[in-house]
Amino acid sequence: PGASAEEAFAHMVAVLAPLEDPHVSLVDPATQRSFSGGAVPRIVSQALAGLPADADDDAQAAALAATVDTIVRAREGYLDAPAETPIPRVLSAGTVGGRTGYIALDALQLRASLDFPDQADTLAAALDQVLAPLHDLPALILDLRANGGGSDRLSVAVAQRFATRALRVKKRVYEGGKLLDPRTIEVPADAHAYRGELVILTSDLTVSAAEVLTLLLAGRPRTRRLGDTTAGAFSDALYKTLPNGWLVTLSNERYEDEAGHSYEAEGLAPDVPTPAYSLVQLEAGHDAALEAALALVAR
């Protein structure tokens, strides 16, 4: 009582920040004051490290955009020839040395609205297009390091292309003051799925629906994960409007593997821990994690 709006906002941030959850946020539409939770991904810290302390939003956005371009340029330098894809800012693909397939999937959202009805069909068709020439290769690298998530429907569509057996995760929602019984998300086995060795690259940028995809594929035989532990933010965001008009988002879901273990807040650890990104190395055209994945499938 008696606190100013600025003081009240700061108090709310102090309560929310320790959750360290990327799906937790607070926005005051009247002043555009905002807070977003979650730890800052390492590559983002590296990208912003060279900016002055008072750098504005435009300068930070430019630095991050340049870093994305650096990531894409470095990884595509390993490809025999990048394949043409209908959604190039989301999906890229090719082969390395003629024997290993490579697919980079940078989002599980193709439109601003997650509910746009044809997203899953569009991504599925694009995946089928790039997978066709890779289907008979003995190994494939699926790069999810820069995937900021999106829709679980798209996660299922991607997992279907690799489902040599049925893949399952459980989803539990906290509602009405209690955690509801789990609902199973199942991807049935597909006779046309890619059957070779699969290496999934992850980082602390791999978040939300991208983590759900990673968890689904963790149940696939002949699959290993390499890179950094994922962000640990599987849950969707629950949106609420406070009485004073502020907007708050919270996590109210748990995703569990078939054994019932939840990786919310801890992230899904790789089988082969390897630093996912080094900006200095990437600027020199050197992607150490991708090289480690290539070495893994060459054994």
Features from the language model and the residues they span:
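Flexible, low-complexity junctional segments that flank or bridge functional domains
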Residues: P1-L140, L144-V173, L179, L238-T241, ...
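Structural recognition of the beta-strand scaffold that forms the well-ordered cores
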Residues: G101-A104, L140-D143, E197-T202, R224-G227, ...
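Gly/Ser/Thr-rich loop/hinge elements
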Residues: G149-L201, L205, S235-T241, N252-E256, ...
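Low-complexity, Gly/Ser/Thr/Pro-rich intrinsically disordered linker/tail segments
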Residues: E264, L268-R299
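C-terminal soluble interaction/assembly domains
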Residues: S208, A218-R220, G227-P243, V248-L250, ...
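Short beta-strands and strand-coil junctions in structured, solvent-facing domains, enriched
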Residues: R111, V207-S208, D257
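Bacterial peptidoglycan biogenesis and beta-lactam-recognition machinery
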Residues: T164-K171, A218-G227
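Terminal peptide-recognition signature
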Residues: V15, I103, L142, L198, ...
